[in-house]
Regions:
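Membrane-proximal intrinsically disordered regions of secretory-pathway and membrane-system proteins
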Residues: 1-253
């Protein structure tokens, strides 16, 4: 070790270099994720890992950003409150029966249990979000089974995809916040809510089309059909994640 490195100034310089390196890798990773779908996955699999942060790190950073935006905007995309489960979700009838039985078992009332559930589901939504990425990987195995890609390819692809999805949701929440600031209705408008959902799914489909072409080298026509199915899979996993959070939180809170 050089004498310069043992001084305070030398230590500070090393810290600055380290953080600059992290920042540059992060920005390079984000730029590649948003503008070159699939390129990060290909680079990782080809061993080009030093210029970028690892897939799990990128996913976790996107997760932190998303839930920070969700908290700032008081939105509940994943951390669905109990009242919404009981009245506004496709499984609301089933949820009403499950919640009623749980209240009896806990010897409590809906009014007392609701804040407990809402607090717990918000925490669970943050810590378990990786389950969505893991659930998507088997869909890739089925869709591209003839490509004989290792399981790790599908896992890395899924982590990058859901990092993109979380950033997409973060951007949507930011736009909604600006809209509300200037007097717009936000998600209170059913039309805007549905339009935004369609736009997000289209963006996801475009990403999948480009990314699967880069990673799996699929022909155009077949790729379109598979992307449609995979996009439906993304939407189904989001709904499935919300329902899973209901069950996990209901029987643990």
């Amino acid at each position: 070790m050089q004498e310069r490195e043992l001084t305070i100034r030398g230590f500070v310089e090393q810290v600055v270099v380290a953080f600059t390196n992290i920042d540059s890798r992060l920005m390079r990773s984000l730029l590649s994720l948003l503008t070159r779908p699939g390129a990060l996955t290909v680079a990782y699999l080809q061993g080009q890992r030093r210029p970028y942060i690892r897939p799990l790190q990128l996913f976790l950073l996107a997760n932190v950003l998303f839930f920070a935006m969700e908290s700032l905007t008081n939105s509940t995309i994943f951390s669905t409150p109990l009242d919404s489960h009981l009245h506004n979700q496709p499984w609301d009838g089933l949820a009403q029966g499950l919640v009623a039985n749980r209240l009896v078992a806990l010897h409590t009332t809906l009014k007392l249990y609701t804040p407990v559930f809402d607090s717990a589901v918000a925490l669970n939504a943050r810590t378990l979000v990786i389950l969505m990425a893991l659930a998507f990987a088997p869909l890739l195995s089925v869709a591209f089974y003839r490509k004989h890609r290792p399981v790790v390819v599908n896992v890395v692809f899924s982590l990058h995809l859901y990092a993109f999805v979380l950033l997409l949701f973060s951007g949507a929440l930011a736009l909604l916040t600006v809209s509300v600031f200037f007097g717009g209705p936000g998600l209170a408008s059913e039309t805007l809510d549905k339009s935004l959902s369609v736009a997000l799914m289209m963006a996801c489909a475009i990403y999948l089309y480009a990314a699967t072409g880069a990673v799996y080298d699929e022909t155009r026509t077949i790729r379109i059909l598979k992307v449609v199915a995979l996009t439906v899979g993304v939407a189904a996993i989001v709904l499935g994640y919300r329902f899973a959070l209901l069950l996990i939180t209901l029987y643990s809170a």
